[in-house]
């Protein structure tokens, strides 16, 4: 993003928060620190807060996007948990600390210049706010909540205002890009979004598959990262794969091309650097939270997770996705809807850590209510076992579009040979 003199003080303060660390160490550190701060605002004990921070920071997505060079996205995501922590403090009557934290972390989010992630997490913050509103009504603390909302909004506006120069110039040049209005597209006929933003096809080109969502539990449920199967040691040791490649080497030269290879990844996306994975133990604690979590905020966090999954499916869930693109403000300005699954990757560790926090603070909980633990362990272990024993039951076709093309080409080679053989007989 452009560097303006007006941002030098804000950038300097950010470097202090990052302890002057560089490269990957800095990204991991601020991911850990930000979520730790959030857990402490939820009154979790330090060891539990550390667990939550590790579960968030060491989920696979962050290392994938660091490797892919999406460094501004990592920075933005690292500043989101402490922003939400500021919101929580505001709603709980800690107006000064909540306002200061909100102001700085929103300012740093926008400074990181990846507005798509900020936009996606607005959904999470709105739903969490609904949860806090319900709690305030139950506890008869509406006045405190209203003050908190006011301070949070003012602090947010200040955080946005200090980045006004960057936002203004981004807005101006966006009009001349594919995210601006198109002079060629006609709204209303086929794709309303193309007239004022990106086309639906482009927005949903990277859409997470419905079955692919199980990668949160089992990382390679769709093969893992894109790449030639020749790099996979297990495939090289498989005799069937060796026979397949030998057959291709014999047949494919007839088409005048080089021998193709199979891809490790066979999901619905055009390609991927790796799956979104949070870990089996974290998933088990999340399932446990369905039984042990208390309060409206936790329930709203579950809605956050479900919403992000539905939106991440993109063209695999067209009714909801198309409605969002056509009707929700600014939703058609961002591509790769699969990336919204990072919101679920936030909600799941948070709910898991909050559940662990309750178990630590109430030592007799498991003794009094042991059945939910058996259910959560059984569901997690049962799914993993089923995927291991009968993977074909859940994921029948393991071929991508490219592999189907290879098969069709092979049929084209073999069919004339079979006809000639029949004619000779």
Where are the regions that the model predicts?
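Transmembrane-helix signature of polytopic, membrane-embedded enzymes
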Residues: 39-58, 94-99
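Periplasmic/ER-lumenal interhelical loops and adjacent helix-loop junctions
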Residues: 1-5, 9, 165-289, 392-425
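Contiguous transmembrane helix-bundle modules in multi-pass membrane proteins
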Residues: 53, 69-80, 90-107, 115-156, ...
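Transmembrane-helix motifs of polytopic, lipid-linked glycan transferases
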Residues: 26-42, 282-285
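Transmembrane-helix signature of membrane-embedded glycosylation machinery that interfaces
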Residues: 35-44, 84-87, 91, 290, ...
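Alpha-helical transmembrane segments of multipass membrane proteins
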Residues: 36-38, 61, 86, 107-108, ...
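Loop-to-helix entry region of an early transmembrane alpha helix in multi-pass inner-membrane enzymes
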Residues: 4-33, 66-75, 272-273, 338-342
